[in-house]
């Protein structure tokens, strides 16, 4: 719009765009070769994906120790109504060993919030039945009811400033705060003892330099350099863009595309990358996203469980009697 306004008013103004969004929604749809049109991925996404993956690894260690009282941990993440950020949780556990549910805005109904809550509860209880604990990563744009969302001057939802949050609404439902007994005690919907608790990383997702992806940092610099070269050449009305080589090993090139093309492009998380059970993503997403987070993730020690013969009488905690 600025570029067109400058032209109409005969202003000597060069307008060049540079992609930048952790949501990864600037660009076109998935192509047949496995890359995205317009701009394969946006600077910022690789780092927020790495941040979330490390958070999941750490949360899993804590959940393994606390599940007897807090069997369910719900982590709400940014991304508005686009699912690329919550999908990155799978990068922490590509072998699917963690009792992890990934809930994307594109996975569930846009209108039936009650059905969404019931569906998530069913999937949580399936995990609890098998593994006695569960970690849920949910995008802030998933419909779980009225959150009292504020909107900016353009009408865009400001999820971080809403009266309620998606993760809080979900744990309220799981814990049964909407159906208290005559003594004021919530009637949990979980099939095990304990509660669901929530966590919202907030702006740490996009600001923590200690979790930055070196690949992301390098590409952010280079796409900025390319934009500068476009401007210095005298060209106008373009955005610098990242073009991914569909072949291995991972490699990108930098190019330009008309701002009008970018403005008319739209990207959502591909339906073909959502698992059949709607609570996970496919290996195709993992293969696409893994190079973006850079160096290998931290590894946690796994102790071998060696049991000795039982000698003491069985002890049952007071709460379980």
Feature-to-residue mapping (PLM):
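Accessory alpha-helical/coil subdomains and C-terminal extensions
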Residues: 1-16, 27, 33-194
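Acidic, glycine-rich active-site loops and adjacent beta-strand->loop/helix elements
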Residues: 19-24, 80-81, 107-109, 202-205, ...
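Residue-level preference for alpha-helix termini and adjacent loops
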Residues: 21, 25, 77, 101-102, ...
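Generic secondary-structure boundary signal with a strong preference for alpha-helix termini
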Residues: 31, 91, 95, 236-239, ...
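C-terminal non-catalytic interaction/assembly regions of soluble proteins
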Residues: 146-321
